[in-house]
Amino acid sequence: MKPSIHSLAHQTMQEWVLEQGEKKFRADQIWEWLYRKRVQSFEEMTNLSKDLIAKLNDQFVVNPLKQRIVQESADGTVKYLFELPDGMLIETVLMCQHYGLSVCVTTQVGCNIGCTFCSSGLIKKQRDLNNGEIVAQIMLVQKYFDERGQDERVSHIVVMGIGEPFDNYNNVLNFFRTINDDKGMAIGARHITVSTSGLAHKIRDFADEGVQVNLAVSLHAPNNELRSSIMKINRAFPIEKLFAAIEYYIETTNRRVTFEYIMLNEVNDGVEQALELTELLKNIKKLSYVNLIPYNPVSEHDQYSRSPKERVLAFYDTLKKKGVNCVVRQEHGTDIDAACGQLRSNTMKRDRQKAVAAVNP
C-alpha cells in the first residue's frame, strides 16, 4: 500500500527529490501543486518531468481517502464519511463559523478511551492514522469548496474527531507541522486546537514542544468518583495527576487551556458540580476557559440524556458568578448524525445488516 504524498513534510520532500537526482526546488514545485493548486493527480503537475512524475506515481498516492457519504446540515455543517485504503471508515466535519471554515479531523480508527457517553468508542481502536491520512481529510474538505467554485479556504482546525490525538502523538505533531508550513496550507498554529481526554504525560510533552497550537482537555466531571464512572481514563490519570500536568503546561507556555464539559442530565450538570469545578480551577482561573457542550444523544448510550436549558443556564451562571470564563457551545449539524462517531457507527451497522441480508435473503 503506497503512502500518501501528504505524509512528507517539506524538508522530507526536499530530501526525497535530491535522492531522485533532482534539484531541491522541485520540492517547492510539488508542494505548490499539492497545497496551493490542490491537484488530484501527479499528471497535473505540468512543470515536472515525465520521469519525476513516474517516480511519484510509483512511490506515492495523492489522495488515500475515498468519499463514502456526505451529509449537509441546514446550518452549513457538512459531515463526511471517508474510507481508508484498508477499508476502515473515519469521519470528518466541516463547520461554518463566523470567523471562517473550521474542520474537525479524526486521528484514529476507533477509540480505546471508553467514555461511556460517546459513540466514537463503540468500536475499539483498530489503528492510528498516519500524518498523510489526517492531512488528506482537510484537502478533501477544501476540494468540496473548490469544485463548487466557492472562493473559501479552510482557516481553522480542531483535532477532536474519532480517537485520542495524544495516543497518536508523533503523527499528530507531524500533521501540525505540515498544515502550519508557510509553503503549504499555512494555517496558523493559533488557529489549530488539539483536544485530549487527559493523557497527563503527553500534556507535559506537548508543553515542552513549544508549539503555539491551542490545548483543550475533555474534563466532563469535577471529581474523581464521577469522572471515573464516565471516563475510564481517569483511573490511569486521576484529576490530581491531570491537573498537575495542566498546571505544568500553563507555567511552561503561559497559554490558556480550554476545558470541555459535556452536559449530561442529572449526572454532572448540577450546581453542586459547578461549584466543585470552580474550586478545581481556582489556581488557574485566569488561563482557563470552560466550554459547556450540549449532549447529542446516542442510542447505544440511552442511560444519558441532554441537560434541559434551565440546568445548563444554572450551571453556566454559577461558573460566571465565581469568575470562571465559560461559554455554552453553539451546536452544529443537529439535523444530521451530529454526535462524534455517529455517522460511522450507523453506517457500519447498516453495512452489517446488508451483509446479513445477503447471506440470509
From Swiss-Prot:
What gene name is listed for this protein?
A: rlmN
Principal localization?
cytoplasm
Q: Where is the Radical SAM core domain?
A: 97-329
**What reaction does this catalyse?**
adenosine(2503) in 23S rRNA + 2 reduced [2Fe-2S]-[ferredoxin] + 2 S-adenosyl-L-methionine = 2-methyladenosine(2503) in 23S rRNA + 5'-deoxyadenosine + L-methionine + 2 oxidized [2Fe-2S]-[ferredoxin] + S-adenosyl-L-homocysteine; adenosine(37) in tRNA + 2 reduced [2Fe-2S]-[ferredoxin] + 2 S-adenosyl-L-methionine = 2-methyladenosine(37) in tRNA + 5'-deoxyadenosine + L-methionine + 2 oxidized [2Fe-2S]-[ferredoxin] + S-adenosyl-L-homocysteine
Function, please?
A: Specifically methylates position 2 of adenine 2503 in 23S rRNA and position 2 of adenine 37 in tRNAs.
Where, by residue number, does S-adenosyl-L-methionine bind?
163-164, 195, 218-220, 296
* Subcellular location per the Swiss-Prot or TrEMBL entry: Cytoplasm
Q: Which organism is it from?
A: Streptococcus pneumoniae serotype 19F (strain G54)
Q: Which InterPro entries match?
A: Aldolase_TIM (IPR013785), Methyltransferase_A (IPR040072), RlmN_N (IPR048641), RNA_MTrfase_RlmN (IPR027492), rRNA_lsu_MTrfase_RlmN/Cfr (IPR004383), rSAM (IPR007197)
Q: Which GO terms describe its biological process?
A: rRNA base methylation; tRNA methylation
The note filed under miscellaneous reads: Reaction proceeds by a ping-pong mechanism involving intermediate methylation of a conserved cysteine residue.
Give EC number(s), comma-separated. Answer: 2.1.1.192
Q: Which residues form the active site?
A: 91, 340
Disulfide pairs here are 104-340
- Molecular function in Gene Ontology: 4 iron, 4 sulfur cluster binding; metal ion binding; rRNA (adenine(2503)-C2-)-methyltransferase activity; rRNA binding; tRNA (adenine(37)-C2)-methyltransferase activity; tRNA binding
A single Pfam family it belongs to is RlmN_N
Q: Which cofactor does it need?
A: [4Fe-4S] cluster
Q: How is the cofactor bound?
A: Binds 1 [4Fe-4S] cluster. The cluster is coordinated with 3 cysteines and an exchangeable S-adenosyl-L-methionine.
The similarity comment for this entry is: Belongs to the radical SAM superfamily. RlmN family.
Q: Name one GO cellular component term.
A: cytoplasm
Question: This chain belongs to which protein, by name?
Answer: Probable dual-specificity RNA methyltransferase RlmN
The residues that hold [4Fe-4S] cluster are 111, 115, 118
Q: What does the UniProt keyword field contain?
A: 4Fe-4S, Cytoplasm, Disulfide bond, Iron, Iron-sulfur, Metal-binding, Methyltransferase, rRNA processing, S-adenosyl-L-methionine, Transferase, tRNA processing
